[in-house]
Swiss-Prot record:
Subcellular location: Cell membrane
UniProt keyword Cell membrane, yes or no: yes
Keywords: Apoptosis, Cell membrane, Membrane, Transmembrane, Transmembrane helix
GO biological process: apoptotic process involved in development; engulfment of apoptotic cell; phosphatidylserine exposure on apoptotic cell surface
Major localisation: membrane
Record lineage: Eukaryota, Metazoa, Chordata, Craniata, Vertebrata
Membrane topology: Multi-pass membrane protein
The reaction(s) this protein catalyses: a 1,2-diacyl-sn-glycero-3-phospho-L-serine(in) = a 1,2-diacyl-sn-glycero-3-phospho-L-serine(out)
Family according to the record: Belongs to the XK family.
One term under GO cellular component: plasma membrane
Protein name in the entry: XK-related protein 8
Amino acid sequence: MEGATFSKYSWIDFVFSVIGACTFLVDWGSDVWLAAEFYRRGDVTWFWVLVGLMALSSFVVQTFSWFWFQYDRELPGFRAQTEAAAVLLGDRAKLSCAVHVLQLGFLCRHISAIRQGFRVWWRKEKGSEYAIYQTHDLSMLRLIETFCESAPQLTLMIYVMLHTHKARAVQFVSIAASTTSIAWMVVDYHRSLRSFLPDKAKQGWGSSLIYFLWNLLLIAPRVAALALCASVLSGYMAAHFLMLWSAFALWAWRQGTHFMDSVAGEWLYRATVGLIWYFSWFNVKDGQTRSRSAIYHSFISTDGAILLATWWCHRDPVQTQSYALALLIALPLFHFLGLLFKALYYCCFHPKLWRPPARDPGLPNDLPDAQVSMRDFPIQDGGLSPKLLNKRMAGQVARFYSDE
């Protein structure tokens, strides 16, 4: 496969940045509203669970954002690039630290991406490279937030509905919207990865639809099975999560991940990967991806079947009579369809064998990544000057589009 051929920052990138920021604000507002509803109704336990999920998600996302800011500051070309593009916060470490401590780093990244994108797309100013660089980081942060907050919250929403045996139409709409949003965020992340590929391999509507469907059909039954089992054995589900999350984090460690530039950052990444794997597959290492994916899906399918069988055996036959049999049939069926759509995607739509562009031949082979300038990656786009390469996302691309 050819090397990367980046497009210039376009109005589509700007629209996605605006939608991402609006989604973040709406999601934050809905979380606050839901927490207030729990508190008003006297559901103190669920109130604190929801607040805890919000706090944990915010802490994880802000920590990733701060780590990346620190890593980027060590790159030789960072200050020159940010000053030339008049980037918000730029190289101001103290201000950036204060913003992240106040849990506003992710929001500032959204504002910076919109501001930079508007200057580049509408005013035709310089800085297209850094605008694209920012969108790549945001796509990864949104994915992390999705599985640290949105997926657990969706599980909680379904659990509350099952536990109370009360369901309103607005709850079904909210659950459907949340599930769709989670699958869409995975597609958005995939779209960001695809931007590194040659133009002929850009993600089309057909590819996006298949990718969306297999994620939707695998994530939805997983979340439903977790909520169903929690509705009858809530205490055991906490132990279930801790055991699987720990095992998944150790599996990520055994695979030798190298996404972050520090030991602490890498362990945070592995812990986050463990949380993502609790809900959905996420490739973290190139080579032999097919075998690792098969192991994961075999385990998750078995675990899901056990969860569903446990719920069936311990449920209240009277309270669940109207929907129990339908769920028992539908959830495994959706899961199986999701696996079929995933196989279809990898057979017909998935590019392979991409590798990040090589460093400048004049650089020493043993030079640490942190000492490689942003301009040391000679990526060309026609007659344009070399462009910035987001090493973090480029590494993810190499792993995701490796030969399976």
